[in-house]
Amino acid sequence: MKQHSLDILLRPRSIAFVGASDRPNSTGAAMLAMCLIDGFDGKIFSINPRLSTLNGRPCYADLRALPEVPDHVVIGVASRFVEVVVDQALELGIRAATIFASCYLDDDTSPRLPARIAAKASSAGMQICGANCMGFYTPSAGLRVASVASPDGLQKGGIAWIAQSGSAFGALSHNDRRLGFNLVVSTGMELVTTVADYMEWALHQPETRVVGLFIETIRNAAGFIAALEIARKREIPVVVLKVGRTLKSAQMAVSHTGAIAGNDAVYEAVFRAYGVHRVADMDEMAATLALFDTPRRPAPGQLGAIHDSGGERELLVDLAEDYGFRFAELASATCTALQEHLEPGLVAENPLDAFGTHNNLEDRFAALIATLVNDANVGLGVFLSNPRDGYAYAENYCSALIKAAQITDKPLALATNYSMADDRKIAIRLKEAGIPLLRGTRNALLATGHFMADREFRSRYSKLSEIAQPKNIVHEAVVSRWKARLADRAPLTEADGLTMLADFGLAAPGMATVTSLAELNAAINNLAFPTVLKTAEDYAHKSEVDGVRLNLTSADEAIEAYTEMAACLGPKVLVMEMVPAGFELSFGAIYDVDFGTVVIVSAGGVLIEFLNDKVAALAPLDCEAAKSLLSELRIARLLAGYRGKPAVDMDGLARQLAQFSQMVALLGDAITEIDINPVICGPDGAFAVDCLVLTKAGVK
């Protein structure tokens, strides 16, 4: 295989351990023991000026005393000694290092130690795992670089597990024998080598089937996007547990590793664009990785489930309904074939309760599983039970699954109804046969959902070579004019914002800004009643200051409303034609310096904060993507009409959203943030009736 720039870090031929020790339970002792536990056959050098030999090997005073220059130096000393070791390594031309220490010093100078090391190493082309990390494992090289002892028996497989949390790094690799890895990394502070770099290395390894990430932030956005693009093209799923969703946890991320968690909507948009599977916790992560680390992918169709319990079948059906999960409709021929293998009193259906008695259990279940899964409407099969090591029925079930796997090419999995079963031996046996074990009914359903969603993503984007780019929806002069206006420090009024929307092809009502009764009279002569009056003074939320008057049906009503509003809030007022009542949404966008412009759609009007129902996507969108985004709102079902209210014109609404996304993509960083709230939707279209714009200058 062609050499990769990270091979020197993750697959070195020789390693020096600075701080090696014979003291029990020390970092120096643990890192040597872990290096040997999986059979690493490269050269190992121990460095400790107080020892001449260690574990029967020579022990050297420092890096300069070594008989040859190693590929990689593992730095297992306290923070105050790290810089000296790094300087020696750079002097000798060592190109990779792992730093366990935090590199925080009480009496540090500016720039701080982490910044000094990062600058020196980057300049010299040195790769660094850490600082403040727990190391990494490369099972294919028989190598563990670690600061603490960990269990033996690490399973090899197709999972690359990359974690910014040291605890998360060990949670899966040290405790779960269902999972097999080809890379496990605790990235730490990422002084040089980032999550994106590890992803890129893993995606070029032939054994990688899935990449799992535990992240607080992304420090190399361009590299991350490039890695996601590689994953998309190679059809390697990426599963992410992104923490820092809430304000409190984002603040904790800063104190933990100095990571800025970032706007969660931006990450949600990036994940959506590249088909990244976002999970909520470690249990869902483990189940999803286990399912993706199989050689098979789901066929067209839905889930086929088989049980040895009627009651727990009902549990599955209840949970499936909670998550909107569908089971495959079986063909009549499949039901007939199933019935031949079922004992009296059992009904051929999906999900299938198949136990009856223990007679001929192994062969009967093998036939039932294969028959169910081979139905044309079934995409994958899951057998749910409560196996435990040493339980006779569990052995029968495992054998049945393995037999069934030999007569179907569709993926199979065993799921437990309880996540704490004693099933380590069963898990390993099934894994060797390419069948994952998923712990817990809920986790099994969630993982299966990701598995099937990945199929849909691949189907939709298999022919695309790149993420969508903005189109020239208006003349270039319009874009240039508005970029110039947005760069002006003069505040952009609501009327300016609505005019901008209209210039880019979005529907907005007729309007005029007035500062006197005379101007109001002139304006309403050119507008259709009913009208709306809104204060044009500097209030972000007009409804909170009684700055909106609706449904004014005559000139007299408009004059009366203007007089009252001008007296309380000031004479500058926006008069607009009133859009017929409809469903209220909000279109918004933010510009992120790392990932670009993100469109956010949510329930609108005064309910925007109350409902917290929003979805995000990278701009721009085409009409199909816009419609798909709208369908993911919790309130989407209401748009189809309810209780006598007419359905919204979804095609028209999607066109408006797509047009908006094209506009913000074309304007780029000229707009820091924009909020159109509400967008009033009905059977005759969608209209923007309020617009707030923030520019780079920080003025409205």
What are these model-derived regions, one by one?
Residues 1-700:
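Catalytic-core regions of core metabolic enzymes
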